Amino acid sequence: MNDYRPLTTEEIEVLKHNDCWAEDWTSVNVSEDFKPNFMHRVMLYGEINIGSFNKNVEVSQGFVKHSGINNATLRNVTIGDDCLIENVGNFINNYTIGDDCYISNISTMETTEGATYGEGNLVSVLNEVGEGNVILFSDLNSQLAAFMVKHFPDKEMKEKIRQLIKTDIDNKMPDRGQIGNNVKIINTKEITNCVINDYCEVNGASRLSDCTLLGSVHGNVYIGTGVITENSIIAEGASVINSVKIQDCFVGEACQLANGFTASASVFFANSYMSNGEACAAFCGPFTASHHKSSLLIGGMFSFYNAGSATNFSNHAYKMGPMHWGILERGSKTASGAYLLMPATLGSFSVCFGKLMHHPNTRNLPFAYLIADGDKMFLIPGRNITTVGLYRDIKKWPKRDLRAMENRKSIVNFDWLSPYSVGEILKGKKILENLREVTGDNVSQYLYHEYIIPASSLHKGIKYYDIALRIYMGAVLKRVLKRDPAITPPASHVGVGDWDDLSGLLLPVSEEEGIVRDVKEGTIENIEQLLDRFEEINANYRDYQWAWTYQMICDYYGISDITLEDANRIHEDYIKARRSWIAEIRKDAEKEFAMGDVEEEVFRNFVDSLDQEIEYEN
C-alpha cells in the first residue's frame, strides 16, 4: 500500500477547479506523485486515500482511457495506483480498492456493519431442514465439505471443525470490503459487503451481497449480466452469468453457472456446470452437470454426474418435512424425465430411467441400469460397464479439467476402477451369485429389494463384473511391474479394508477414521493441517491401492503371494477381459449407429479409437 501525504494547497485548488468537493480536505491523503488534474466532479467524505494516475486503462478491446476519478461520491475509501473510477451513480462507502482497477457505471458499493463477506455461513445440504452441515469459507474444498456432511452428526466433531474454521476466518477477515488489483466492475447496480480478489470481473450484475470472489492471476472470476449472489463464495476460475440467482452457496474452481440457473444452500465443486435449472440443498461434487430448465437437483449428493432434462428428486414425504436425501455415487446419470424417491443410494456409475420408487439402495450393485416401467422397477446390474457412454465419460473427464494447476484445491481422482468401485463390484458379484444359488437357475427373474432382475441380466451382470475385476487387477499389476519387476508385496497394510469416496478423493476408511481421531484429539490444530492431510492421503493413493489390490488378487486367484508366473496369468486374463470389454462397447456403438441418425464419420472415428485400445495392453 502507498505511503500517503496530505494534499497541497495547489492540488486542492486544482481539484476545486475540476468541480471536486471534500467534507474536510485535511482528511484527504494522496500518493507522492498524485496528479489532481485527473479527477473531475468527485465528492469526498470521511477518510480518503488516493493513489497515482500514471497509466492508461483499457476499458474495451483497443479502447483506452487515462486513469482517474470522474463523477463519483466516495466515503472512507482507499484507492491504489492507476485506477479508473467513473460514473458512480450513488456512492462508494467503506472500501479499499487495489491497483489498476476499472470501476464504471455502478450504483452503490459499500461495507456495512456486521459484514461477513460470505465467510462462516453455515448451510444445510442434503437435509433441506437440517441444522447445518457445511460451513462456507474461502479454503473450502470438496473433500472437507464431504467430510463435514458425513461427520457433523457427531457433535464433538462438528464443534471442533467449527472452531478450526472460525479461527481461520478470524485471522483473514478484513475490517472492510476489499477490491483487489486488476479488477473490473462495470454496469453493476449494487455491491454490498464483498471481497473481490485480483483479476475478477463483474459486468452487468444486479446485486452482490456478502460475497467473496476468489480470483487470482491463474484463474479469474467472472460475474455477468443480471446475476444476484447473496451470502456466497465463488472460487478461482468460476463464472456466474446470464441472470443466475444464488443464495448461501459455494461455487468451486472452474465451475460454470449460467442462463437463469437458481440455487440455494448448495455447493458446487471443480468443473461443475449448471444451466437453466435449479438446485436446493444439493452437494454437487466434481464434474456435476445439469443443463436443462426443467431439472431440479434437491437433497442429493453427486459427483461426475449428468442430469437429463426434467430430472427430479422427491425429498418430501409430506409428513415430517423436506428432510429426506440421497446419494448418487460418482459417475451416475439420470435420463430425461427421471424421478428418484428419497431416501435412496445408487452405486457408482448407475443410470436411472423413469419414476423410480421403493427407495432403491444399490450401492453394492454398481454400474447398474435402474428402469421404471409403469409400477414395475427393474435392475440391470453391471450393464453400464459395457456402454459407449461410460467409455466416453472416463476418457473425457480428465481432458475437461479447466482448473489451473495452481487452483486445484479440490482433489479429483479420475480412476473409474479403484478399490472403492471395485470393492462394490466384488460385493455385487457375490450378491448376484447368492441370488442365483438361493433361487436357482430355472427362473425368469430375481427380486432384489423390490427391484426385478431379469435372469439374463443377472447372468450378464456376473460376467460384466468379472470382466471389470480382471481389467482392474491387470491394470494395477501392470503399473506395479513397471516400477518393481520383482512384485514386492506391499510394505504396509494401510489400504486393506473398506474404502470411501470423499467427493473426488478415494481413500481407505482407516485413513478417514484417523483424521476424525486426530481432529477430536487436537493433533490437527488448524485448517491448513486438515487440508494437507487430504493431500497427503491422495499422494499415497498408489501405495494404498497396491496394498488393497495385492490382497484382492490373492483372494481372487486363491494364492498367498504373487509370483511372476501368477503375473503372466493375470496379464493374460487382463488382455482377454479388456478385449471382451472393447468388443461389447463396439456392439453398443454399432447398435446406436444402426438407428440411422449417427453420422458415419462420427461412428468410424469412435470405432478407430476402440481399435487403438490394443496399444494399452502391455
Question: How would you label these PLM feature ranges?
Answer:
Residues 1-2, 163, 172, 199, ...:
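Polar low-complexity intrinsically disordered regions
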Residues 1-9:
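Intrinsically disordered, low-structural-confidence terminal and linker regions
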Residues 9-10, 14-24, 30-53, 57-69, ...:
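Glycine-rich hexapeptide-repeat left-handed beta-helix
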Residues 68-80, 84-159, 186, 532, ...:
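Phosphate-/polyanion-interacting regions in eukaryotic proteins
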Residues 163-180, 185:
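A charged, amphipathic alpha-helical module
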Residues 179, 183, 187-202, 210-221, ...:
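Core alpha-helical transmembrane segments of integral membrane proteins
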Residues 373-618:
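Long, compositionally biased intrinsically disordered regions
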